[in-house]
Structure formats: structure tokens, C-alpha cells
């Protein structure tokens, strides 16, 4: 039994040098070798010989690099659908013995621009191998989607889908007249789902806070004094009326009541209660609970500086000093 000849019976023009790698992929190298053969077929060893004869970069490579590019050639022949293996006797099925021919598939061969193997056109195989119909070039987007996936077969696509506004499906058509409004209300009443926007869900999900201040610390307001027929307006009453007309510092609490409570309450208690009342269930991440008790004394003292001053902690309201 003689070994198959690996001599190439045609002339090969050398290209490149042994330093620069040729700008071709392994698929292009295989296609170049098979296309140069008169019979348009080659064995694996003949493909090796063609690549070595044409490109000194692969011929002059060391043993490790030579084994690497030869393995890549074998992998591309076995895994790429562009190439098929034929037996030497011409049968359709190739045997497991060495010396089989490799040739390109006529309907699935790699396409190149006028023999320029540097710029390879990748032929997309579509979805035909997955069990669906292949995509055909058509102007109707609906036809393309119906051929790609069976899920879109039952959908009715508009004819002008390519020129439509992409956000048109997400826009609500408001009625332009009283007649359109009446027709829209009839359609909404007949259907199970209404297109109107219900804002009550936000009211229930996000309740509006009435106050950030614990009103338990505020002293109850005094009952109004009984005024005689001859009303004498003292100076204190005038000041009180001015305070009443002022804008409350805290929502829900009048200015007079708030200022009166400040004079009767320890500022440190108000400051601590504000932190505790703000970090409620409604605002769990508003403030962290205090690490230490606010009634403790500082370990370091500074002349002319009071740590009980609320302005040191970022509060704008200046509370009067405790007596």
C-alpha cells in the first residue's frame, strides 16, 4: 500500500515573508488552496503543502507554531459548514481512513470579492437550521417577523410600520371634542379595563406627612380671656396678634403655641425628640438613631463653645438656652 502523493501538480506564487503574518483567516487559506486546485478538491496534507509553499511565514515556523496553525486548519475543516469531506473513490460518504478529499459546498461556499480573500463576506445562515423558515428579503416588516418566529404569525402589523413613530404605541389618544369624549367614555365603560389614570393609588401608597414634630411636647394653648365691653388693647396683645399672622415654623402648629412651648421645654429634649420622631416607620432611613444619650456631658470642653447649641448639628432654628 503506497502513501498518497502530496506533490502539488500546479505552480504556486509565493507571497509575503517569514516575519509578517499573512492577513488571511484560516477559512480563507483553506478556500484559497482548494480554489487553486484544478479539481477543486484537496487532501489535508495537500492543503498543508499549499499553505507552506505560498506563505513563508507558515513554512519557516518552529515546531510549536507549526503544530498550532495545522490544528487550526483541521478544526476549521471539521467545524465549518463551508467544507465537506469526500472519499477518494468518489462516494458520497467519506470513510474514517486518511487521505479523504476536502471540497467546498456549492450552495454554502465562502464568498469573496473577485478572488480577494482578505475581505471575506460572511454568509449568514439564518434560522433555517433551528427548525424555522429562512429570512427572505422583503419590504414588509410583518412578513419578515412572521417568517422568523411562529409567535408573530397571529399579529396584525400595520402597512406603514417602517415610517411610523416608534413611540406611537405608547401614546394615549386624548379626545379632541365633546363627541370624541362621549365616545371614549362609552368605550371605556363597555370594556373591562379603563384607560384613565387613577391617582388614588399614590395617595394610599405615599401618605402625605402632616408634621415632623412631636406635638406631645407642645404645651396646650390657653383659653382666650374674657374681654369686657370696653376693650382695652394692651401692648402684649398687639405683639401676640403679630405673631399669629406670622407663618408657622412647623406645619400644623401656630407660631404663638410653638414659641410658648419653646420657653417651657428644655431645648435638648426638643432636639432629641425631633430625631426620634423623624426616624419613624414612614421615613426609616431619614436619620440614624442617636448612638449616645443626649444628656451626657462632653468629655472635652472648649472656652466659649457650648455643645448644646443646636446650630452645631445643622439646625437653623436657634433655641433659647435652658435656664
From Swiss-Prot:
- PANTHER family per the UniProt record, alphabetical: FORK HEAD DOMAIN-CONTAINING PROTEIN L1-RELATED, FORKHEAD BOX PROTEIN
Record's function text: Probable transcription factor. Binds to the DNA sequence motif 5'-[TA]TGTT[TG]T[TG][ATG]TT-3'. Regulates sexual dimorphism in the gonad, promoting male gonadal cell fates in chromosomally (XO) male animals, yet plays a role in gonadogenesis in both sexes; probably acts downstream of terminal regulator of sex determination tra-1, to control early gonadogenesis. Positively modulates expression of homeobox protein egl-5, probably acting indirectly, during early gonadal development.
> Nucleus: is it a keyword of this entry?
yes
Location in the cell reads: Nucleus
Annotated TM spans: none
GO biological process per UniProt: anatomical structure morphogenesis; cell differentiation; gonad development; male germ-line sex determination; male gonad development; regulation of transcription by RNA polymerase II
Taxonomic lineage: Eukaryota, Metazoa, Ecdysozoa, Nematoda, Chromadorea
In the record, what terms sit under GO molecular function? DNA-binding transcription factor activity, RNA polymerase II-specific; RNA polymerase II cis-regulatory region sequence-specific DNA binding; sequence-specific DNA binding
What CDD domains does its record include? FH_FOXL2
Where's DNA bound on this chain?
21-122
Under the heading InterPro entries, the entry gives: FH_FOXL2 (IPR047515), Fork_head_dom (IPR001766), FOX_domain-containing (IPR050211), TF_fork_head_CS_1 (IPR018122), TF_fork_head_CS_2 (IPR030456), WH-like_DNA-bd_sf (IPR036388), WH_DNA-bd_sf (IPR036390)
Which UniProt keyword terms apply here? DNA-binding, Nucleus
Keyword RNA-binding applies: no
Q: What is this protein called?
A: Forkhead transcription factor fkh-6
Q: Which domain of life is it from?
A: Eukaryota
Task: Read off the SUPFAM superfamilies from this record.
Answer: Winged helix' DNA-binding domain
Q: Which Gene Ontology cellular-component terms appear in the entry?
A: nucleus
Amino acid at each position: 500500500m503506497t502513501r498518497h502523493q502530496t506533490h502539488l501538480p500546479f505552480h504556486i506564487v509565493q507571497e509575503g515573508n517569514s516575519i509578517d503574518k499573512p492577513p488571511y483567516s484560516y477559512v480563507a487559506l483553506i478556500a484559497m488552496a482548494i480554489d487553486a486546485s484544478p479539481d477543486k478538491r484537496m487532501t489535508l496534507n495537500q492543503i498543508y503543502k499549499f499553505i507552506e509553499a505560498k506563505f513563508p511565514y507558515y513554512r519557516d515556523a518552529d515546531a510549536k507554531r507549526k503544530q498550532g496553525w495545522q490544528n487550526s486548519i483541521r478544526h476549521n475543516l471539521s467545524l465549518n459548514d463551508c467544507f465537506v469531506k469526500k472519499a477518494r473513490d468518489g462516494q458520497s460518504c467519506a470513510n474514517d481512513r486518511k487521505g479523504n478529499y476536502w471540497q467546498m459546498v456549492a450552495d454554502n461556499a465562502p464568498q469573496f470579492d473577485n478572488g480577494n480573500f482578505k475581505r471575506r463576506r460572511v454568509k449568514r445562515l439564518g434560522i433555517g437550521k433551528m427548525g424555522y423558515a429562512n429570512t427572505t428579503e422583503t419590504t414588509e416588516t410583518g412578513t419578515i417577523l412572521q417568517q422568523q418566529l411562529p409567535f408573530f404569525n397571529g399579529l396584525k402589523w400595520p402597512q406603514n410600520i417602517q415610517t411610523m413613530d416608534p413611540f406611537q404605541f405608547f401614546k394615549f389618544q386624548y379626545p379632541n371634542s365633546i363627541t370624541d369624549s362621549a365616545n371614549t367614555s362609552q368605550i371605556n365603560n363597555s370594556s373591562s379595563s379603563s384607560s384613565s389614570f387613577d391617582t388614588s393609588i399614590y395617595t394610599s401608597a405615599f401618605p402625605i406627612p402632616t408634621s415632623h414634630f412631636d406635638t406631645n411636647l407642645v404645651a396646650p394653648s390657653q383659653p382666650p380671656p374674657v374681654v369686657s365691653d370696653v376693650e382695652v388693647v394692651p401692648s402684649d396683645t398687639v405683639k401676640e396678634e403679630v405673631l399669629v399672622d406670622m407663618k408657622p415654623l412647623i406645619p400644623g402648629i401656630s407660631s404663638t403655641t410653638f414659641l410658648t412651648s419653646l420657653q417651657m421645654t428644655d431645648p435638648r429634649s426638643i432636639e432629641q425628640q425631633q430625631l426620634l420622631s423623624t426616624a419613624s416607620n414612614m421615613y426609616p432611613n431619614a436619620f440614624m438613631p442617636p448612638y449616645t444619650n443626649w444628656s451626657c456631658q462632653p468629655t472635652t470642653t472648649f472656652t466659649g463653645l457650648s455643645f448644646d447649641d443646636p446650630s452645631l448639628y445643622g439646625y437653623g432654628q436657634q433655641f433659647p438656652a435652658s435656664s
